[in-house]
Curated annotation (Swiss-Prot):
Forms homodimers. Interacts with ubiquitin-protein ligase UBE3A/E6-AP; this interaction stimulates UBE3A ubiquitin activity. Interacts with host BAK1. The gene is E6. This is Protein E6. Its main location: host cell. It is found in: Host cytoplasm; Host nucleus. Plays a major role in the induction and maintenance of cellular transformation. E6 associates with host UBE3A/E6-AP ubiquitin-protein ligase and modulates its activity. Protects host keratinocytes from apoptosis by mediating the degradation of host BAK1. May also inhibit host immune response. It comes from Human papillomavirus type 48. GO terms for biological process: DNA-templated transcription; regulation of DNA-templated transcription; symbiont-mediated perturbation of host apoptosis; symbiont-mediated perturbation of host ubiquitin-like protein modification; symbiont-mediated suppression of host innate immune response; symbiont-mediated suppression of host type I interferon-mediated signaling pathway. The lineage of its organism: Viruses, Monodnaviria, Shotokuvirae, Cossaviricota, Papovaviricetes.
Length: 142
């Protein structure tokens, strides 16, 4: 069993006593160094550091988008009408964790309400509810 290392960037920086701005991690997929902007995005999305053979990895934005597309194409389970989701999972909309289907950011309450008021479906992909965040909506041209 591998030793327990930190899985979020804050804990990683504290554990190894390194400034976030000096952090250098490679992408788990393309193996290129993840830029500081992509690391900030990774942190903001509350994604986990991946450990392989005691080596930490993150994920760059380009690979994250490709991963999201791959998961949608290969692990799609179902769609749910946005007005029915709360009854389906028996939680308030504000309490349901929903990530963006394109970039993996967590949707805030206003983004969830956008789906509700615009009758945009939520998707269940690999056991996680997905929608579209405001940044990706603007790229979709809605």
């Amino acid at each position: 069993m591998e030793p327990q290392f930190p899985t979020d960037l804050d804990s990683y920086c504290k554990y190894f006593n390194i400034s976030f701005f000096d952090l250098v991690l490679k992408c788990i997929f393309c193996k290129f160094s993840v830029s500081i902007v992509d690391l900030a995005s990774f942190h903001n999305k509350r994604l986990s550091v991946i450990w392989r053979d005691n080596t930490p990895f993150a994920c760059c934005t380009k690979c994250l988008r490709l991963t999201a597309l791959y998961e949608k194409d290969n692990f799609f389970v179902c769609t749910a009408k946005s007005h029915l989701l709360t009854g389906l999972v028996k939680k308030e909309l504000s309490d349901i964790n929903i990530r963006c289907q394109h970039c993996y950011s967590f949707l805030d309450y206003l983004e969830k309400l956008y789906h509700l008021y615009n009758d945009v479906d939520f998707l269940l992909i690999r056991g996680t509810w997905r929608g579209v965040c405001r940044n990706c909506i603007s790229h979709e041209g809605r």
